[in-house]
Amino acid sequence: MDIAALLSGGVDSSVVVHLLCEQGYKPTLFYIKIGMDGAEYMDCSAEEDIELSTAIARRYGLALEVVDLHREYWDNVAAYAIEKIRKGQTPNPDVMCNKLIKFGCFEQQVGKDFDLTATGHYATTLQLGGKTWLGTAKDPIKDQTDFLAQIDYLQVSKLLFPIGGLMKHEVREIALRAGLPSARRKDSQGICFLGKINYNDFVRRFLGEKEGAVIEFETGKKIGTHRGYWFHTIGQRKGLGLGGGPWFVVKKDIQDNIIYVSHGYDAEQQYGYEFRMKDFNFITDNPWEGSTGEEEVTFKIRHTPEFIKGRLLHDEEGYRIISSEKLQGIAPGQFGVIYDAESRVCFGSGEIG
């Protein structure tokens, strides 16, 4: 079996290679190069990633190829993020990177020549009813199925997640025992294409700054200024520069560039328990095809370890969720990710409208 393994230079993908080799496979290794336009945004972490990936390849006597998808990334993902931010929405570039780049452009250019593509994602695949489904990871804190919830059946059927059945500390222990060069490397944080680049610097480069008012939601009183609504997201608490906190962003007026904040964030009053999703993507199949009733599900609206219980309803306008608990910071542009009631199978996701 021919396996392509995606390396990032981190401990997770390094352990993937180790486990595959232990099982007798000789995967071909690939490092996908993405990044920002402009020399001032060059990030030295990419060079370190390639060095560590090269060390892993040499360690196991495997071929490593660097695949440059910088232009494809910019055209498909970075531009998507900027457009969402411009509209006052909250993008999820990691979701789109997986869908369009790692398992999209890479598959079209390289992965098509292999039987499977192995990655260091914390996820699993399940065989149910003769079909492949995306399953959650053993480690609920590291589970990354919400970042994979826009892929399609062709993509999920070719994916292999060797560490999906392990806890993070077990992955570290394997790396330490094997003496892998990335064993003690810290996990990456933040948006996949930014590396060590500050998020606000990235937004500022493309959208600039424009001063606007910060207004207390309950009183209508101006309590400060901001440098552009695009720097702020619904539910944001940090980085507002206001005294007497905590303050939370509860509303944005895109037309007039106004940020509304609340001192005592009342999620129930602001949002209730319900949200709609548009353009819902079922990864494998719609398990409720033809059903007109309510379905008991669990879901996520952001990358957190917790799965929230709720009811999924379908009508002429699409799908909506009624949550079992009040929700904080529902952000248009993000994805509502739907799972079965036991949080074992990830069925897919839709953009929160």
UniProtKB/Swiss-Prot annotation:
Disulfide bonds join 97-192. Its EC number is 2.8.1.13. Residues 142-144 are annotated as: Interaction with tRNA. Its main location: cytoplasm. It is found in: Cytoplasm. It comes from the Bacteria. It catalyses: S-sulfanyl-L-cysteinyl-[protein] + uridine(34) in tRNA + AH2 + ATP = 2-thiouridine(34) in tRNA + L-cysteinyl-[protein] + A + AMP + diphosphate + H(+). The record marks 121, 334 as: Interaction with tRNA. GO terms for biological process: tRNA modification. Keywords: ATP-binding, Cytoplasm, Disulfide bond, Nucleotide-binding, RNA-binding, Transferase, tRNA processing, tRNA-binding. Gene3D superfamilies: Adenine nucleotide alpha hydrolases-like domains, HUPs, Translation factors. The active site is at residues 97, 192. SUPFAM superfamilies: Adenine nucleotide alpha hydrolases-like. GO terms for cellular component: cytoplasm. CDD domains: MnmA_TRMU-like (cd01998). Catalyzes the 2-thiolation of uridine at the wobble position (U34) of tRNA, leading to the formation of s(2)U34. Belongs to the MnmA/TRMU family. This is tRNA-specific 2-thiouridylase MnmA 2. It comes from Bacteroides fragilis (strain YCH46).
